[in-house]
């Protein structure tokens, strides 16, 4: 599950205020030493005020997913959908020290720039200094992990291979097609 988080760090962060869910999509990185998730959010995001005092949160990470046609199988099957998801629950505490927030932003940038590291966010970056007053840093202590991996694993070996190839092919093609249409 950690590999899903590292490979697909854009998370869906869910908090609840007055029985109303607040949902934000933002990158979170996994800290190998603490086992916590680290992130930051725009201070004016309504969810920011809930990211403190050990408030409960739910986090969802999404890996590749696609429709699987029965036509790819060597055996008779029904249409299905394959996907990889990781559901986490935890408690969040705020990071209030501006240097600690900067360090978390630098650490996140280092992680996201892998493997080439074409950009380095320097601690004295004036844009970061200007933005730091508008960002709330936070850390999530994960209390519950749940992997949701539906990958045709109940099929025959060749059908599993075919489903894997379809998942790879469909994701590559759908990304290219979608971005061509909207970007």
Feature map (PLM): residue ranges:
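Hydrophobic, proline/glycine-rich low-complexity stretches
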Residues: 1-6
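A generic structural signal for short beta-strands and their flanking turns/coil linkers
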Residues: 9, 24, 35-37, 53-57, ...
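An N-terminal domain-start capping segment
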Residues: 36-57, 165-174, 180-183
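C-terminal edge-of-domain segments
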Residues: 95-183
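Short, structured beta-strand-loop surface elements
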Residues: 44-104
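Short beta-strand segments
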Residues: 8-43
């Amino acid at each position: 599950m950690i590999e899903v988080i590292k490979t697909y760090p854009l998370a869906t962060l869910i908090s609840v205020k007055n029985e109303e869910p607040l949902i934000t999509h933002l990158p979170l990185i996994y800290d190998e030493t603490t086992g916590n998730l680290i992130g930051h959010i725009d201070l004016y995001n309504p969810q920011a005020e809930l990211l403190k005092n050990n408030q409960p949160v739910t986090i969802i990470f999404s890996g590749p997913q696609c429709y699987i046609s029965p036509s790819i199988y060597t055996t008779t099957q029904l249409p299905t959908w394959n996907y990889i998801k990781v559901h986490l629950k935890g408690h969040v505490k705020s990071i209030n020290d501006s240097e600690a927030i900067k360090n978390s932003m630098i650490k996140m940038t280092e992680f996201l720039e892998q493997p080439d590291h074409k950009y380095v966010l320097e601690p004295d970056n004036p844009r970061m200094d200007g933005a730091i007053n508008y960002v709330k840093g936070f850390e999530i202590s994960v209390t519950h992990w749940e992997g949701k991996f539906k990958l045709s694993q109940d099929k025959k070996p060749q059908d599993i291979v075919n489903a894997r190839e379809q998942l790879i092919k469909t994701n590559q093609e759908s990304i290219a097609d979608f971005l061509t249409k909207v970007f």
